[in-house]
């Protein structure tokens, strides 16, 4: 994949962030998301690529969002020689944070060669992510305590000095309490586990581990970032009823998720390694801040590009 494409894809997240920024603090997360989607699609269709959205915002019947299977790129005038790429997008990671004017909302995408990324339905995913210093020591088949002990040894840090990032959701209440009983420092975020996953792998960050259940699309994007940063990741797909509890509606959604996984040849019981999520190192990752945050400052019209994180290998 041509490295100069990294600059083109940086324009995509910058445009999405600027569009969403106009809705910061206005209480309308759908409008913020739609503005970012429209901007992202417009710029993607100006790039000379043969692109396909493999991780997006739902299925084809949920258009006008950037849906799974949507074709993007400037293909009308060029019939051959285009880069064939798979694209994972999250136009606004942290729609609620954007609507409420809270920190750490970002626009993000990852790009890889055709077939690079796991194609999974938009469902929940259990994630365990670490930086380069603990690469190869995590395993979701083990308990969280065992993984924390292994990371502690790899990083040569006592457990009391480890920091675990986790989404501050009701489903994680017991996990957070258990971590704090161990003496682990907990960084509990309202939303936005992609930004937190990157903090695991960057120099001078306090975050050592990301754990918890979040979105599968965000998980694949995090995997691409770990490829670029040399980190590591394990994941396992989760049905809605496993995460949200058993109700008629949750069971209906879970049955659909199970059927989609069967169609895609995905084993729900399998622990997915980094190689399963992002299959090679030739990836481009771009993120731009919408609101101020721990990873990126917000994007402003006078400062476009200065708050964009571009990673490629």
How would you label these PLM feature ranges?
Residues 59-62, 171, 190-197:
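Short acidic loop-to-helix transition motifs that present clustered carboxylates
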């Amino acid at each position: 994949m041509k490295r100069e494409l990294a600059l083109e894809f940086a324009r995509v997240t910058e445009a999405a962030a600027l569009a969403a920024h106009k809705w910061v603090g206005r209480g309308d997360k759908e409008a913020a998301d739609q503005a970012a989607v429209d901007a992202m699609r417009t710029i993607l269709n100006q790039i000379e690529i043969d692109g396909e959205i493999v991780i997006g915002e739902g299925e084809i019947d949920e258009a006008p969002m950037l849906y799974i299977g949507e074709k993007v790129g400037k293909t009308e005038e060029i019939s051959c020689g285009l880069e064939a790429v798979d694209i994972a997008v999250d136009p606004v990671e942290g729609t609620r944070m954007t609507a409420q004017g809270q920190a750490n909302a970002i626009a993000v995408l990852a790009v890889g060669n055709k077939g690079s990324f796991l194609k999974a339905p938009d469902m929940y995913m259990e994630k365990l992510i670490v930086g380069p210093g603990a690469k190869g020591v995590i395993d979701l088949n083990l308990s969280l305590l065992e993984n924390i002990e292994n990371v502690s040894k790899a990083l040569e840090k006592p457990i009391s000095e480890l920091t675990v990032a986790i989404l501050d959701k009701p489903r994680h209440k017991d996990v957070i309490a258990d971590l704090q009983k161990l003496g682990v420092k907990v960084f509990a975020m309202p939303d936005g586990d992609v930004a937190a996953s990157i903090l695991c792998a960057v120099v001078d960050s306090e975050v050592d581990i990301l754990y918890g259940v979040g979105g599968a699309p965000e998980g694949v994007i995090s995997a691409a970032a770990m490829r670029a940063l040399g980190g590591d990741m394990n994941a396992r797909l989760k049905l809605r009823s496993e995460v949200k509890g058993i109700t008629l509606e949750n069971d209906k959604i879970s049955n659909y998720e199970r059927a989609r996984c069967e169609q895609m040849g995905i084993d729900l019981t399998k622990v997915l390694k980094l190689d399963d999520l992002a299959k090679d190192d030739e990836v481009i990752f771009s993120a731009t801040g919408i609101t101020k945050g721990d990873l990126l400052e917000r994007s402003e019209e006078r400062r476009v590009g200065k708050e964009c994180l571009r990673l490629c290998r």
